[in-house]
Amino acid sequence: MPTNRMQIGLCFDRTFPPQLVTELARALDRGGAGQLWVIEDCFYTAGVSLAASALTVTEQLEVGIGILPAVARNPAVTAMEFATLDGLAPGRLLPGIGHGVQTWMAQMGARPASPLTSLEEVLVAVGRLLAGENVTTHGHYVDLDGVQLDQPPASPPPLLAGVRGPRSLAMAGRVAGGVVLAEPAGPAYVRWALEQAGRRPDDFHVATFGVLCVQRDREEAYRIMAPWLARVLDEATTAITAVPFYDDLAARYAEKGLDGLVSMPPQWWTELAPIGTMDDAFEHVDALERAGVRSVGLYPSPDVEVARGQVADIVALAAR
């Protein structure tokens, strides 16, 4: 079972075929890696069924769900799903709920007028249900009348909020048991996020996502991942704008393009993700642990064969 040390695992890419989840889960479990994170992006594979598949074929592995869109299910059903998963593998579930991509929510006719309010109401309701309470609430988005789970978890897992911005982080600090921070979640971003949440890492479960690329030749890893970093810079989310060298990085990319990213200082790459040599990867995850992170999910290559080979890298990082 998981220890007090930061746990490291693999993120199951949304494009992977669902039958691959049991193979990768078993490989991680045998190797001693701590976690597998399943991703629910619309309209790819579903998080709950992937999590159930992974939990039932493993003995020690924690499985995180990162994340379920808050308004895609009734919160009573979400709580039932989480309670059932915890019953299948007590103590090995890390459930996450987030805003969801709003354009996807609109496609389903489920886009809320206030993503922040809807997420807060869902987190509170699901948390109360998992705690075994009889819940009656009539909010803007959650309407429950005397709902109580028949089999709530004996020890409810921390309910994690998949959030990014200051207002959402502050809300998560009030009502959630932790956060899932999307990639590239480096140590500077983690410290900023904890500050926004108004929480300390000793009582708030911080999970981060990153991308993994370990090569013997550091520059080769940079060449492989430069297009990914370019996309991150184009999106300019708080995960990248929070890094202390963001202005210099953005200017470098604007002036020199991908070549400028490949040749940027190695320590910038190490801040952003486990990209470079294995020593660089160790340095990155150690910095995350010092920043207060408890769980790290790493995206492998979307190429299945390459991803299979990267399981060994994740096992090595987990055994550090």
What are these regions (language model features)?
Residues 6-12, 36-38, 63-66, 93-97, ...:
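Hydrophobic faces of well-ordered beta-strands that scaffold small-molecule active sites
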Residues 44-53, 183-199, 304-309:
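Active-site-adjacent beta->alpha loops and helix N-cap segments on the catalytic face
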Residues 32, 54, 85, 126, ...:
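Conserved, mostly hydrophobic/aromatic
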Residues 1-66, 157, 304:
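N-terminal beta1-alpha1-beta2 module of alpha/beta enzyme domains
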Residues 16-28, 81, 162-174, 225, ...:
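Short, acidic/polar
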Residues 2, 112-148, 190-290:
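An alpha-helical appendage that flanks or caps ligand/catalytic pockets
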Residues 6-19, 68-75, 153-163, 212-215, ...:
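Active-site mouth loops of central-metabolism enzymes
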Residues 45-68, 72, 121-125, 129, ...:
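Alpha-helix-loop-beta-strand connector modules within alpha/beta enzyme cores
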